[in-house]
């Protein structure tokens, strides 16, 4: 992948494998940084006819333990067959202003490979109702007051403040449309005006 790739206002759904796959291979080395902004990933790993396919991650942000500072921000992952957001062993990915909801595996899983330093960034993230508790155990400093992670039963921040579906305008997906401002989800997973990180 060459330099300067940026996805803005894109949707990936019902792909046989992952929605976004930013995999780097040991054989070929690191790919260039990719920025994913105001994007949506849902129902990946599940074809539109109901058959399952590959891994089924929403946003896969790396691979083979190779560090690339890919950025994911202002984006949403829901209903993916595996994880909503995964570093896939990239120890340097950046995740900001992201909602990950009701994915079959982890909503958020950030981990590396080998003994290299973990340099993840995780800010203003909401994770609710994942298939398992979010995985940030390799860099516990990611747990902050402005990040709400799913522990398998509830979503809370570093202080222990809990949130639930009530922070959203709606949790019923009714499709999407494209507008000049991005993707309109008709209130689905939109934060209410009175919610403050």
Over which residues does each language-model region extend?
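Right-handed parallel beta-helix
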Residues: 1-16, 30-48, 68-83, 92-104, ...
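Acidic, glycine- and Ser/Thr-rich low-complexity intrinsically disordered tracts
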Residues: 115-197
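Extracellular beta-strand/beta-solenoid scaffold signature
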Residues: 1, 14-28, 49-64, 79-86, ...
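Acidic-and-aromatic substrate-binding clefts and catalytic sites of carbohydrate-active enzymes
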Residues: 89
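Acidic-enriched, low-complexity/disordered segments with a strong bias for Aspartate over Glutamate
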Residues: 17-21, 49, 55, 64, ...
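Intrinsically disordered, low-complexity segments enriched in small/polar residues
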Residues: 2-4, 10, 27, 43, ...
């Amino acid at each position: 992948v060459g330099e300067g790739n940026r996805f803005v206002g894109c949707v990936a759904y019902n792909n046989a494998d992952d929605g976004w796959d930013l995999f780097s291979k040991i054989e070929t080395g690191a790919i260039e940084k990719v920025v994913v902004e105001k994007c949506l990933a849902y129902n990946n790993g599940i074809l539109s006819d109901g058959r399952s396919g590959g891994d089924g991650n929403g946003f896969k942000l790396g691979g083979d333990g190779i560090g690339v500072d890919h950025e994911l921000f202002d984006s949403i992952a829901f209903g993916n067959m595996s994880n909503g957001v995964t570093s896939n062993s990239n120890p340097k990915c950046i995740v900001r202003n992201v909602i990950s909801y009701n994915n079959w595996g982890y909503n958020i899983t950030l981990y590396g490979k080998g003994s290299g330093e973990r340099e993840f960034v995780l800010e203003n993230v909401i994770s609710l109702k994942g298939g398992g508790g979010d995985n940030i155990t390799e860099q516990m400093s990611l747990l902050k007051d402005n990040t709400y992670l799913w522990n398998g039963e509830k979503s809370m921040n570093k202080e222990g403040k809990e949130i639930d579906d009530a922070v959203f305008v709606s949790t019923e997906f009714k499709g999407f449309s494209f507008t000049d401002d991005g993707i309109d989800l008709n209130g689905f997973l939109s934060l209410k005006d009175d919610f403050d990180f």
